[in-house]
């Protein structure tokens, strides 16, 4: 989906990172993932989420290019670019199930 690529291309320079392939899949257990090779994968259902939530997930996965973990340093990287990330995470916890009810 062009939406995901354009948002990743927008946010990557803010984080000082690059990425390789970007795939949008029918993921059921993860919203997104980042491989050590820099490949990004996202659930197509994120296209149904509010734009700030989609952007948070993209920033989250791109941040793994700097920190391949969920350490304090990782969250500092996310926070520097997406200071509202906690509210976006809450939105996903509250509304994520409804996104999974959507059919392609």
List where the protein language model places each region.
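Walker B catalytic acidic pair
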Residues: 61
